[in-house]
């Protein structure tokens, strides 16, 4: 779908047959037939009134071809006449070389379009309706561009607009902005102030919408068909103010002027020799087919038409005056997206081709390896079958009578006639296997012998280390026993020390009058070991007194009877060595030590 609303364009094409103003392009084209073009005098510039619009390629963007006629390669200047001072919308539009009905209809369509957008937003929700109203006011005030308005409107309503919306706004929004500027100047206000005070003139909800909102929005779930005409019949009061308009895609056939492409800037001639006015450009990708449909029946006329079009197209390009046409082709961003998609598709195709080529190469290599393996096994099978055949033949010849003489000759002839390549006798294989087995057996025996020798050496090392450790432990035990004897002797000699802690004693055990302590705490703590000795010392016959002479140094024989009771220091040393709660006897320590 190409985005200029076709209804307005077709109405313009139908109504431009009747000249609406003296300076319309239709009169210029008709008058130029009888007289050469004459430069009209420019109207006086009124400082207080609106400034006449200068025709530049970007002055009009409403999609209507207002270029002056080109006769004999000389473009005539644009007409700048007006009927009078601009006192209304139609009179203000005369400075733009537009008929009054054309400008009023375009403005009415634009206002109804904006009103329909706001009503659609209000139908969704009041918040979205307020957003749409703000966007519409910002668009009319030129604070946002048409593209930004398009994007923000789609984001607010979450509905895609039809493709003709942007070209329609580009074509008709300048007319509305000029009208707003004229009214604001008349009221001595800025356009934004005037629009804020007279918002109802732009978004007039009392005027019915020209069409359903589905004509402005893309069908999300539908099949893309236009709404039925019964929905238009509901708005019958619309026909009282605005004439009915044909659908956007229906071709108008009322005008006698033939259709042609927008690139054709020269007016065509009818059979009577009169010029027809240039119709406004519609959907330009189909108008050229409509324009030249009657020429395809006559090839000569078609060639002449093509030559005239190319010649005048070049003249219009080089003549310095060319109107800007509404371009309905893709924008640069859309072209970039299309190229990006195309590049991505080509890359995917290249990747698929590369993967297919690799897969075919892998399959080819696998097929070659399979073929080689199959040939190898075929050769092996043939060799085995030949060996079996020769073996059976030899056995049959040996058992058959009269074959002993020729057996050696036949076998020799057979072995000599057999090719040397690829043939190995069975005896050779047997000898080779036997040699390999012998080598394996010898290697295993050597390995076992080496392992046995290593184990023997390890056992010897372990035995020597064990003997050394036992000797060391015995030496340590002996040294500990000797140290214990020395400590015992020292404790016996020093009777002034405490038997519990070794400090200077101040008290004596009342039971035996032998044990000495530094205090009652040490006596109570040592009582678990001393009470046995204390009881034995009371009887006066202790077995330890007989074993005293066995102590090294012979000190026990020279001591008195009351000192024959063993010292508790011996119990301490035995307790530290054996970790037991009862003290050991001196004879037990002597026996262990010696």
Swiss-Prot record:
Residues 98-206 are annotated as: Interaction with PRDM14. It is found in: Nucleus. Zn(2+) 2 binds at residues 509, 512, 530, 534. Residues 442-482 form a coiled coil. Zn(2+) 1 binds at residues 498, 501, 518, 522. Expressed in embryonic stem cells. The modification Phosphoserine is found at residues 24, 255, 400, 567. SMART domains: TAFH. Residues 426-475 are annotated as: Nervy homology region 3 (NHR3). InterPro entries: CBFA2T1/2/3 (IPR013289), MTGR1 (IPR013291), NHR2 (IPR014896), TAFH/NHR1_dom_sf (IPR037249), TAFH_NHR1 (IPR003894), Znf_MYND (IPR002893). Residues 322-368 are annotated as: Nervy homology region 2 (NHR2). Keywords: Coiled coil, Isopeptide bond, Metal-binding, Nucleus, Phosphoprotein, Repressor, Transcription, Transcription regulation, Ubl conjugation, Zinc, Zinc-finger. Residues 48-96, 220-257, 388-416, 538-594 are annotated as: Disordered. GO terms for cellular component: nucleus. A zinc finger (MYND-type) spans 498-534. Changing residue 105 to D: Disrupts interaction with PRDM14. The keyword Zinc-finger applies. Changing residue 363 to R: Reduces PRDM14 and OCT14 occupancy on target sites, no effect on interaction with PRDM14, predicted to impair homooligomerization. Residues 227-242 have a biased composition (Basic and acidic residues). One of its GO terms (molecular function) is transcription corepressor activity. One of its GO terms (biological process) is negative regulation of neuron projection development. Transcriptional corepressor which facilitates transcriptional repression via its association with DNA-binding transcription factors and recruitment of other corepressors and histone-modifying enzymes. Via association with PRDM14 is involved in regulation of embryonic stem cell (ESC) pluripotency. Involved in primordial germ cell (PCG) formation. Stabilizes PRDM14 and OCT4 on chromatin in a homooligomerization-dependent mannerCan repress the expression of MMP7 in a ZBTB33-dependent manner. Loss of Mtgr1 impairs the maturation of secretory cells in the small intestine. It is linked to Required for tumorigenesis in a AOM/DSS colitis-associated carcinoma model. May be involved in intestinal tumorigenesis. Belongs to the CBFA2T family. This is Protein CBFA2T2. It comes from Mus musculus (Mouse). The lineage of its organism: Eukaryota, Metazoa, Chordata, Craniata, Vertebrata.
């Amino acid at each position: 779908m190409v985005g200029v609303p076709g209804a307005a364009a077709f109405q313009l094409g139908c109504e431009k047959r009747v000249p609406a103003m003296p300076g319309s392009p239709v009169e210029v084209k008709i008058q130029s037939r009888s007289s050469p073009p004459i430069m009209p005098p420019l109207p006086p510039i009124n400082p207080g009134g609106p400034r006449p619009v200068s025709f530049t390629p970007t002055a009009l963007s409403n999609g209507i071809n207002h270029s002056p006629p080109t006769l004999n390669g000389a473009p005539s200047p644009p007409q700048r006449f007006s009927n009078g001072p601009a006192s209304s919308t139609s009179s203000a539009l005369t400075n733009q070389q537009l008929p009054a009905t054309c400008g009023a209809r375009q403005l009415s369509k634009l206002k109804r379009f904006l009103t329909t957008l706001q009503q659609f937003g209000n139908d969704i929700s009041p918040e979205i309706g307020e957003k749409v109203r703000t966007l519409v006011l910002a668009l009319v005030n030129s604070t946002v561009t048409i593209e930004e308005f398009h994007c923000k409107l789609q984001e607010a309503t979450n509905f895609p607009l039809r493709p003709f919306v942007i070209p329609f706004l580009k074509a008709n929004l300048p007319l509305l902005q000029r009208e707003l500027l004229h009214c604001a100047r008349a009221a001595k206000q800025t356009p934004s102030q005037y629009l804020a005070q007279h918002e109802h003139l732009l978004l007039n909800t009392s005027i019915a919408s020209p069409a359903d909102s589905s004509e402005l929005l893309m069908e999300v779930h539908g099949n893309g068909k236009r709404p039925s005409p019964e929905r238009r019949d509901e708005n019958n009061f619309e026909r009282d103010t605005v004439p009915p308009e044909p659908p956007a895609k229906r071709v108008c056939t009322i005008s006698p002027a033939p259709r042609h492409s927008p690139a054709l800037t020269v007016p065509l001639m009818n059979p009577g020799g009169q010029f027809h006015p240039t119709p406004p450009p519609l959907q330009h990708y189909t108008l050229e087919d409509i324009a030249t449909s009657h020429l395809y029946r006559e090839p000569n006329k078609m060639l002449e038409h093509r030559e005239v079009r190319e010649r005048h197209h070049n003249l219009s390009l080089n003549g310095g005056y060319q109107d800007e046409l509404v371009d309905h082709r893709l924008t640069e961003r859309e072209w970039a997206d299309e190229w990006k998609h195309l590049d991505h598709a080509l890359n995917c195709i290249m990747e698929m081709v590369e993967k297919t080529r690799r897969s075919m190469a892998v399959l080819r290599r696998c097929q070659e390896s399979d073929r080689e393996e199959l040939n190898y096994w075929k050769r092996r099978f043939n060799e085995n079958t030949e060996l079996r055949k020769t073996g059976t033949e030899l056995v049959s010849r040996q058992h058959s009578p009269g074959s002993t003489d020729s057996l050696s000759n036949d076998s020799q002839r057979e072995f000599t006639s057999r090719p040397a390549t690829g043939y190995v006798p069975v005896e050779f294989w047997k000898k080779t296997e036997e040699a390999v087995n012998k080598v394996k057996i010898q290697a295993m025996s050597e390995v076992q012998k080496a392992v046995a020798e290593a184990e023997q050496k390890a056992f010897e090392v372990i035995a020597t280390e064990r003997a050394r450790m036992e000797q060391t432990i015995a030496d340590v035990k002996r040294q500990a026993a000797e140290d214990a004897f020395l400590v015992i002797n020292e404790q016996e000699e020093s009777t002034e020390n405490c038997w519990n802690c070794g400090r200077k004693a101040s008290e004596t055990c009342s039971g035996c009058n032998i044990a000495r302590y530094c205090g009652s705490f040490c006596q109570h703590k040592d009582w678990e070991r001393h009470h046995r000795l204390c009881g034995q010392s009371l009887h006066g016959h202790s077995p330890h007194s007989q074993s005293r002479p066995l102590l090294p140094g012979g000190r026990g024989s020279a001591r008195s009877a009351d000192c024959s009771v063993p010292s508790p220091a011996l119990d301490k040393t035995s307790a530290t060595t054996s970790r037991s709660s009862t003290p050991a006897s001196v004879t037990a320590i002597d026996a262990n030590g010696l």
